[in-house]
Amino acid sequence: MGNVEIPNWLKALPLAPVFRPTDTEFADPIAYISKIEKEASAFGICKIIPPLPKPSKKYVFYNLNKSLLKCPELVSDVDISKVCKEDRAVFTTRQQELGQTVKKNKGEKGKSNSQRSGVKQVWQSGGVYTLDQFEAKSKAFYKTQLGTVKELAPVVIEALFWKAALEKPIYIEYANDVPGSAFGEPEDHFRHFRQRKRRGRGFYQRKTENNDPSGKNGEKSSPEVEKAPLASTSLSSQDSSKQKNMDIVDEMEGTAGWKLSNSSWNLQMIARSPGSVTRFMPDDIPGVTSPMVYIGMLFSWFAWHVEDHELHSMNYLHTGSPKTWYAVPCDYALDFEEVIRKNSYGRNIDQLAALTQLGEKTTLVSPEMIVASGIPCCRLVQNPGEFVVTFPRSYHVGFSHGFNCGEAANFGTPQWLNVAKEAAVRRAAMNYLPMLSHQQLLYLLTMSFVSRVPRSLLPGGRSSRLRDRQREEREFLVKRAFVEDILNENKNLSVLLREPGSRLVMWDPDLLPRHSALALAAAGVAGASAVSPPAVAKKELEEGHSELQNKEKTSLLEELSLFMEKLNDVYYDDDDGLLNDFQVDTGTLPCVACGVLGFPFMSVVQPSEKALKDLSERQGETDAQEIMTLSSEKSDCEWKTSSRYIRPRIFCLEHTIELQRLLQSRGGLKFLVICHKDFQKFKAHAAIVAEEVKVPFSYDDVLLESASQEELSLIDLAIEDEEKYEHSVDWTSELGINLRYCVKVRKNSPTKKIQHALSLGGLFSDTSQMLDFTTIRWLQRKSRSKAKPSSTSSFTPCEHLEVKADGKLRDNLDSQTGKKEEKIIQYSRKKKLNPKPSAEQVQELATLAKSKDFDKTCKNFSSRSHLDSAIRSEMNSEIGDSGRVIGVSFSINPCSSSFTVGHGQEHPEITVKFGSDLDGNVTNSLSMVNGDSADLTLTSISREQHQGHSMTSNNNGSNSGSHVVASQTILVSTGDNHDGPRKLSGDYVCSDVSVRGIQEAVEMSDQEFGEPRSTVTNIEDEQQSQIVKPTQREAVFGDHEQVEGAEAVSTRENLCSEIILHTEHSSAHVGMEIPDINTASENLVVDMTHDGEPLESSDILSSSNGDEASSNGLQVLNDELSMESEVSSSENTEVIEAPNSMGEAKKKRKIESESETNDNPESSIGFIRSPCEGLRSRGKRKATCETSLKHTETSDEEKKPIAKRLKKTPKACSGSRQQEVPTTTHPNRCYLEGCKMTFESKAKLQTHKRNRCTHEGCGKKFRAHKYLVLHQRVHKDERPFECSWKGCSMTFKWQWARTEHLRLHTGERPYICKVDGCGLSFRFVSDYSRHRRKTMHYVT
C-alpha cells in the first residue's frame, strides 16, 4: 500500500485545532468549550484530548452490552430462549453505498446512472450483530480491501476512501443512531438527571400509549404484557449473573474509563451540564439529550450535515480504529449549500429543496469540490480516547478507518443562542417538527443562575479560581441574552397593543378544556394503580423501617454534612426544584409563519370580516359561499370557529406585526395576545439581572388579565386545529404565510415555485438568479479626448485631476448590499460663483454628451489617457466594498471635462461632464447610469466675471485661470431623491481640503493676480481647515446663495501661492510629492490611509503656465497626527514648529472645538467650507533645520505664525532638536505607576485612569492601578510565568497558579484540616475550602 498517491488537495487541507485541557479546566466542559469557542469555531470543528488515558476495550464492551440490553426494540427479532444473556446485547446495522454507478456513453466520459452525483443510497439491511460478531466481520472486510497491512497512515486511508468513492460501488455496514452509551453510569452524581430521564421516558410512553393504533382484533397492546417474557427471562438469570457483575465493577473501579465516566464529560450527562442551554429540555431525545452509539467498520461514513437545531455536538471515540472528519466553518454554510446545490443536485433545484436534501444525510461529496469552490475546509483525525466538538451551523462529514465504537450527544453554549431562531426556521422549512423552544430554554437557564438564597449566606467563601471566572462569563452571556429577549418581546408587545381592539391575557396550559379532561383521566388511572398488593406494601413498610433505623444511627456531623451537600446542590447543580417552579412540559406553541416554538408571548390571529370578504373573492364558489354565510350569520360574534378555512391560527409577535401590515389595506385582522403564566416569575428577576449585566431595563409595564373561559376555549381550539389540520388549505395558505403548507406544496409539486409572503431569511428565494457581486466588473467611463473647437481662439489643457481612494476588499459583499451612501468628491475651483445652470441647459448638454459626434470630436484629448486606463483597470480589480471604495476620475478641458465615480453595488458609474461654450462660460451636465438618479450641484465659473480680479490672459492665449488657487469639497448623493438631509453612512471623516504649497512648488506673483499679497492674518484665518464631524456629514444641495454666504472671504485669502492637502482621520497618514514634469502639467501623488489600511496613491495633475514644481514635493500633516506616528513613519521626518507651538496648538484645538459647536446650522446643510477661505500667506521655508527654527519679527514673511508641518529630516539635523521630541509619546497613553497602555479615545483613557477595566463587557473596578494592569492578562491571555520544573513547558497568568502547579511535581500538600480526627491534607486551597464547606470543619 506504499504506492498510494496522495492528492494535492488532501495534502493542502489544514488541520483542525487541538486542545489539551488541564485537570482544572477539564472539570467544567461547558466553561472550557466556551473559552476555546472563538478560536475553534473559525474552523467549525476541534479536537480535545482529555488529561485521562483512553478506557480499556473490556470496560467499553461491558458498559455497551449493558446499555444495549436496556433497549428491547433492538432484540425484538432475536429468539431470547436460544441465546445466552451476552448474546442478547445486539444491534442492527444500516447498509451504505460507496462509489458511483457510471454508464459510459459514446463521446462522453461517463454519467451517473439514475441518480445525482453525491447522493448515496442508504437503507436498512436487517443485519443483527453482537459486538464480537460485527468486529469479526469488520476485520474480514478490512483484509479484503487493504490486505494484511495492519497500520496505515491516516492520510493514505483517506486517499483510498475518496478514490473508492469514484469507482464501482461497494457496500458497507454501519450501526449508526443506536440508543445507548459505552460510558458507565456515574456514582452518586446527577441524581436529578436520572429522575428527569425517567420522567421523560414516562412522557414518551404515555404519548405512545395514547397514539398507538389498536393491535389485532381491535385490542390495544399493553407495554407491560409485551415486556413480560423479556422481564421474566431477565429475572431468572439475574441471580446467577449478579455476583459476576459485581466482580467486574469492583475490578474496573479506579480505571481510566471509570474516572472518565464519573467526570462531567460523560456524554450521558453533557446535555444536562450546568451552563448548557439544553439542560432544561423537557423531553429525553436520543441523540440530543441522551447519547447514541455509532459502531463502524472500514469506510463506514456519515454524510455532510449539521446537527439538529444546529446545536453543538460532542463525539467520543471509545475504542477501535481512528476516524477522519472534514468540516466547513459556520460562516460559509450558505456558500457550501449553494456549491452542493449546483454541483451535486443540479441547478434546477432551488435553495429550499437543496437544504431539505442535505437534511436527509445522504450527501457524500469530496472536500476537493468544496475547496475548489473557494470554501475553506479542514480535516481532523480522531483517535480512541479523544473528543471531537462541532460548532453550530458547521457542516461536517467523515468515515472510519476500521472497526470502532464512538458516541455522540448534543449540547449548547450561550453562543448557540445567536443562531437558535434561524436554526428553528430552517428546521421547520425542512418539514421537521421543532424539538425545543430556544426562548424557554434561555429563560429557564437564566433562572438557574439566579440563586434562591443569597450566596453570601453560604458558609465558607467561594473560590476565585479559573473555573469560577469562566462560569461567571458564561452566566453573563446568558443573562444579557435573557434581558435583551424580554425587552424585544416588550417592544413588539407595545406595537401590537397600540392597535384598536387589542387584548392581552395570561393563560395557564393546565386550565385548557382538553388538557383538564386528560388530567382527570390520568388522575383516575393513577388512583387505580395506587392500590398496591399486600406484598408490595409490606415490602415498602420494611424498607421504610430499615431506613428509619439507619437515620437514627447517623451522627450529627454526618447529618450536617448531608445537609450542606444538598444545600449546595440546590444552589448550583440541582434543578429539580427549579423545574417544579415552572411548567416545562407545556406552554410552547409553534408559529404558523416560521415554525418556531414561541414562548412566553404568542397571539391567536384571525382575519377581519373585511379581509375575509376580500379572500372570498379569490376562492371557489363553495368556499366563498361558506365564508359569506358565516359572515352574515355571525356578524355579532367576534371570533368565527365553525369553519375550518377561517379558523384562528397561532403566530409569534414578530410575524403578527408583519401580518397586520400585510392585511392593513385589506381590512386588518383580529388578534388575542396570550402570555404564559410563568412570565410573571421570569419578569420578577429581570430588573435585577439587567442591573448585573449593566443593560438599561426600560420596560413598559402592561396590564395582564387572566384569560376567560371563552378565551381559553379559543386558545384550545387553535392548538387543537394546529395538530389536526396543519397541512390543510385555509386563509394562511391563501395569503402565503403558512410555512409548512408552502414546504408541502414545493415538495409535492416542484414546478410550483410558491413563495412565502414574509421574510424568512431568504429560504424561498431563487439563489440561481441572485447576483454574484464578486464577478461584476465595475464600469469606469474613459476620459473624453480633446475636442477641436470651432472657435479661432486656442486653449491649452488646464487641469486633469484623478483621485482614487481604495479600501480593503471584503469577503462578505452581500452584507453591504442596499446601502446608499453620499460620496465626497473634491475638485479645484475658482472663488467666484455663477448661478446654478437651468434644468434645460443640463439636459441639453447631457444629450450632447451621449451623442456619437461629441465622442469623435473629443477622442484625441488628454495625453494622459493611457495612465487613466491603467489606474481604472487597477481600480476595477480592487473595488469590492460599497461602503469604503470610491473611484473618482476628474478632468477639465476646454471642450469637455468629466469625472466618474466608481463605487459599490448600487451605482456602478456616475459621470458628470463640464463643458465650455464658445463664450467661455463653464457649464455643467449630469449623466445618469442604470436609471438611478444622482443629485449633484456644481459651480459654474464665468471667466468674464472673474477676469477682473483673479484671471488674466497670457501672451500665447492660454487661460491663466488654470492655476489652482482653492479647493472645494462637493458631496454627491448617489441614492434616491430625498427632500431632507441624509447623513453619510460610511466612516469617512474628511476635512475640507485646502491646498497649500511651498514657494518652490507653486509660485505666483502679485502682479499675475492683479493685487498685492497680504501678509496680515488673524486667528480666524488659521481655523479655516475644519474637521468634518459626523453631524456635519449631511448632503443637501440648495441654491448657490446658501453657499456664497459661507464662502465670503477677503480677496487676499483667495489668492494663495501654496497648496496643502489636509485629510482628517484618526489614523490617517498623508504624504504628497510633486515630481518634476513639464510646465503644462504637474503630477501630484497623494498617499493616504484609512482605518490603518494603506490606500493606493492617486494622481492629481494640475497645470500652471509658467509655474515651477519642486521635486521635493509638498508635505502634508494631519492636525491630530500623534507624535509617535510622526517619528515612526517610513520616511525619517521631524516636526518643525515655533517654540510656543504647543501653546498655540492647544489654543487652536480649543478654538476649533468652539467654532464647531457654535457653527451656523445652515453650514451643515450646504457646501463644506473651503480651506482656502481664510488661508494666510506665510514665509519661505529655510533650507536647513536650524534656520527654519528661527523666529525673526523684522521680516514680513517671518512675522506670520509658523505652521506645524511634516518635513524630511536631513542627515545634518540630528542634534538636540531631535532629542527634544519624545519618541514614545501618545495622546491617549497612560503613565500611571509605570503603565504604558494606549487607548483609542480619551474617554477610555479616563476610564482606565479611574482604575476601571475598559474591555467590552467587563467594567471591573480595582482599588489600585497596579491591580488593573495585572487584570489585563485575563483579556490579553498573557502568561508571563513559566514552570521551573525541568521538562515542563506550561505557562501561567498568575504567580499563585504556578505555585500550585509546582505542587503537582513535588507532591506537596500544605493544607491540612485542623479538626481533630480528620487530618486530611490537600494540595489546593480550593479543595480545602470545598472540604470545609461540605464537612463543616471550621476551627474557631
Curated annotation (Swiss-Prot):
Keyword 4Fe-4S: no
Gene null: resulting phenotype: Early flowering a reduced number of rosette leaves at bolting stage, but normal development of all other organs. Hyper-methylated genes with accumulation of H3K27me3 histone marks. Reduced FLC expression. Partially redundant with JMJ14. Brassinosteroid-insensitive phenotype.
EC number assigned by the record: 1.14.11.-
One Gene Ontology CC term in the entry: nucleus
Zn-finger (C2H2-type) residues: 1228-1250, 1251-1275, 1281-1305, 1311-1337
Binding site for Zn(2+) 1: C1230, C1235, H1248, H1265
Bias-annotated ranges (Low complexity): 1124-1133
InterPro entries given in the database record: JmjC_dom, JmjN, Znf_C2H2_sf, Znf_C2H2_type
Chain sites annotated for binding Fe cation: H305, E307, H396
Enzyme class: oxidoreductase
UniProt keyword list: Activator, Chromatin regulator, Dioxygenase, Iron, Metal-binding, Nucleus, Oxidoreductase, Repeat, Transcription, Transcription regulation, Zinc, Zinc-finger
Domain named JmjC: residues: 262-428
Ranges annotated as biased composition (Basic and acidic residues): 217-227, 1188-1201
Region (Disordered): 195-245, 1092-1225
Positions that bind Zn(2+) 2: C1253, C1258, H1271, H1275
Entry keyword annotation includes Metal-binding: yes
Catalysed reactions, as listed in the record: N(6),N(6),N(6)-trimethyl-L-lysyl(27)-[histone H3] + 2-oxoglutarate + O2 = N(6),N(6)-dimethyl-L-lysyl(27)-[histone H3] + formaldehyde + succinate + CO2; N(6),N(6)-dimethyl-L-lysyl(27)-[histone H3] + 2-oxoglutarate + O2 = N(6)-methyl-L-lysyl(27)-[histone H3] + formaldehyde + succinate + CO2
Subunit and partners: Interacts with BZR2 (via N-terminus).
Protein name in the entry: Lysine-specific demethylase ELF6
Source organism of the structure: Arabidopsis thaliana (Mouse-ear cress)
